[in-house]
Structure formats: C-alpha cells, structure tokens
Amino acid sequence: MPLIESDATGSPTDQLQRLPFPPVTYSHILHCSYDYWQPKYRALTPKSRIIPLTSSFVSYLHADGIVLPPENTPPTNDDDDFSDDPDAEEEADPSKDWPEVHAQIKSAIAELDGKVTPKLNWSAPKDATWMAATNDLQCRTPNDIYLLLKSSDFITHDLEHPFDDCVPDTSYSPAPISTPPEVKYNLVLRKYVNFNPSLEFRCFVRNRILLCICQRDQNHFDFLFELRDTLRSRIQSFFDEKLKDSFPDSSFVFDVYIPAPHQRVWLIDINPWAERTDPLLFSWLEILRMKDPIGIQEEDDSAEEQFVRLSLNGHSNGDQKPESESESEEEVEKAEDDAPLLPEFRLVKRDDPEAYSFTTPQYSAHKLPKEVVDASMTGPGGMSEFLGQWQDILSRQGQESDTESDN
C-alpha cells in the first residue's frame, strides 16, 4: 500500500499515514533472499536448483527489449538455399555472453523433470504469466524463462530496488556501511508442481510470535472453513518447531503450502516484515495494531512468582489468588483476557465482494499492449521503429486537434 505524501509534516494526519514499522535493515532483506534461507530449510522446501548469475546475465536482464537466444532447431533444405547469402543477417544470440548460465539452466530443467518455475532472489515473475503460452510460471525451455524474467516488473524491482527504504544494520558493526551491500543474484528453478492455490497460506510473525494467517488466493473456498482449526494447528506446530528460533530475524512473513491430506507443511517463501510485502486479506495497519495471541498457557512452577496461569478450558487450578500476587500481575492477566487465544486465521467469506474474482486478471497494472511486446521481441531496432511510429501518430493527432480548434 503506497504512502500518501503530506505537506503538513509532523501533523496527526501525517502520523496516521505513516505505518509504524520498525526500520527495515539491509540484513533483513538479505535474510529473505532465497539463496540465504533455502539451504537452512532444504528439507522443508520443494525440490529446486539455485544458479549463481554472472554480471553479463544480470546486464542482459537490465537491457531494454526482449532478445531471446535462437532455438536449437535442425536446419531445413530451405535454410540451405540461403546459407551462402553474404548479406544474410546472423540471428542475434545474447547467450554467447553467458554460456555457463545458459548451460546450467538447460541442465537444471532436465534434472527437474523438464518443467520448472523461475524466480530471482526474492520475486517470481508472476506479473508476466500473461506472456506464457500456459498462462502460468511453467517453463520447459530456457527461452520460456528468459521471456518471463525480461517481461516482469517484479524482477526489475529485485534488480534495481532491493533496498528501497532500508537502513544500515548497526548490530553487526560499530561503524555500519551507509551504502547498500552488493547483491549476489541467483536464478532459482523450482520443480514445477501444479499447486492447489486454495491451500497456500501467508503467515505473519512478529517478535517470534505467529500473529495471524490468511489464504493467499483471494477467492472463496467453502471447504477451508471446516479445515481452519486443523490447518492453523499444522502451521503453528511447523512454525514452533522449524522457524521460530532458527530464522535470524524476529519478525518476518512466510508462505506455506499444505496439500491433502494436510499432514505436511511445505515452506514456499520467506518475505520481509515490511510494507513491500502484500498483507493480502489484512491491512498492514491492522496487523501492526494486533495484540499477540496468548496461546495455551501452562502452569508456572516457579516458587518466586507463586501464581497459576489459566489453562485452555478457562478453569483455574486454584479457587483463590495467592496473597503474594501483585496488582501488576492482575493488570497483565486482564490484558491477556483481551488478547486472542490463537493466531487469527482469515479466509475469504462467501459474501465477500472479492470472493468470486476468477475472471479478474491478476497484476493487470503490469501488462503492456501487444504492439509494444511484439516490437520489443524483434530486437533493438523494432522498439525504435515502434517509437517512431508512435510519435508520428501523436503528431498527427495534435495537428488534427489544432485544425478543429481553428474551425
């Protein structure tokens, strides 16, 4: 959600418009990079390959236009007829500048049964699936991957703005570097699995407490309501056992997939605790103001504190409060009574106006007119020609407007 600029800095209105996030550090963004966290949780993630990218390949992703390597098609007799033409233009092959990366991508596709889904360090090119023949992230060839990466605004953000609104991390050095660290970019190829989108969930963690959960797909699925308690229990146990004490940052957002029969939880992604991460069915202001769930409290055996927590069923193990219990403890218990017992698990309800968006195109703001895409794929000259034609059209429209105003 974008922040709204205000001229009255420091005013109450301005303060409300600024979400109360803690500073987002460079290290937090790096910890959410796939190549950092996936090796720590390899057994919890779907099968994948991580390919380090060379500077020449990163430059290719930065470059304007979409120029793909030639497909490896066998020559035909018609091709032989023109092979001796000295004026024939050789088809551009950008992969000549990064042959190692190209070869590793081919090899990884073969190792992962011929179908993969790509992403960079943080983002997958989900906004570019309209460019794919399958209308999803499924890729069978290197060119399928290059086309998605080159067409995606999400990938461009990974490349150009990974540390927007971040601050240096002072916990690692008394004199932190003021400039953002250099990013070692990687291409992640995950074995293609036809995920059931209704069983993907986003989970929000604040100060190592699982705060709330929601479904990722914003359509209504009636069967999820019967499974809500089971799924919440699975996610809570997964977090407590696998992520709570092992991830370096205390606040983060993680995505999971829990396929039928809903016994195993797969870790799909880890995202920053930052405004750039989509809160989906929540708002960030709502999340930041949430009280921590108190969970199932156990009896305290400490002789010093001499009081007993309430158990899950709400019955105290003692009829009277110990005399040593202080007023502050009463206030704490009163605050806990107001707090939720379990993390909120939000699902799309049947009567939600957004519940039936099957025909609504995702990421439509990132799409381009077909003419622009076609021009970019003809090579560097194609886009220049298209821009020239576009300027001519605008010029003619301006002349026609001037003529009409004179009349």
From Swiss-Prot:
For this protein, the record's InterPro entries field holds:
CDC123
Compositional bias of type Acidic residues: which residue ranges? 77-92, 325-339
Q: Where in the cell is it found?
A: Cytoplasm
Q: Which GO terms describe its biological process?
A: eukaryotic translation initiation factor 2 complex assembly
- Domain of life per record: Eukaryota
Q: Where is this region: Disordered?
A: 68-99, 312-346, 374-407
Q: What does this protein do?
A: ATP-dependent protein-folding chaperone for the eIF2 complex. Binds to the gamma subunit of the eIF2 complex which allows the subunit to assemble with the alpha and beta subunits.
Full protein name: Translation initiation factor eIF2 assembly protein
Could you tell me which species this protein originates from?
Emericella nidulans (strain FGSC A4 / ATCC 38163 / CBS 112.46 / NRRL 194 / M139)
